[in-house]
């Protein structure tokens, strides 16, 4: 199929698990439809951007848009821009780029190391645009609006306050 990708099985597993995160008032047919759309959007993104890799949590960002009254093509168009600019750094094959802190700001890197703060303490917040920790839909949409209208590092800035 034109939507084959090495991460297809992981995408399907994650999307199937996210069914319990959907609003309770949705009918099972609507849930199935949203999950099918979610898989198609994610695979289209991965096939379109062959240099990028799927990460667990990307489906949560896409789901935020699919739950709005947007169709699948509009959701893909939004995500197509986001994966190129706002969340691109999350889509590389490894976290090697995070080591650039040592090169670019050794004083900050030294402080973080001394504080014994693991780099991943807020990683899921940033990777999912807070969808795992912000349970109120209106609050999540407000954060999403902020992230769309701001510098791509805004999710990190929010994590610091």
Regions found by a protein language model. Name each.
Residues 1-161:
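Helix-rich, well-folded core regions that mediate interactions or catalysis
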């Amino acid at each position: 199929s034109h939507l084959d990708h090495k991460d297809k099985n992981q995408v399907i597993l994650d999307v199937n698990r996210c069914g319990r995160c959907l609003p309770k008032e949705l009918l099972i047919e609507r849930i199935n439809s949203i999950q099918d759309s979610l898989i198609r959007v994610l695979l289209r993104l991965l096939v379109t951007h062959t240099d990028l890799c799927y990460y667990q949590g990307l489906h949560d960002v896409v789901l935020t848009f699919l739950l709005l009254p947007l169709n699948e093509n509009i959701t893909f168009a939004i995500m197509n821009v986001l994966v190129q600019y706002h969340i691109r750094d999350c889509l590389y094959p490894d976290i090697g780029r995070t080591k650039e802190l040592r090169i670019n700001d050794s004083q900050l890197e030294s402080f973080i190391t001394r504080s014994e703060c693991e780099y991943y303490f807020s990683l899921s917040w940033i990777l999912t645009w807070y969808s795992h920790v912000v349970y109120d839909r209106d609050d999540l949409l407000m954060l999403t609006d902020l992230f769309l209208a701001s510098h791509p590092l805004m999710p990190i800035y929010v994590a610091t306050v």
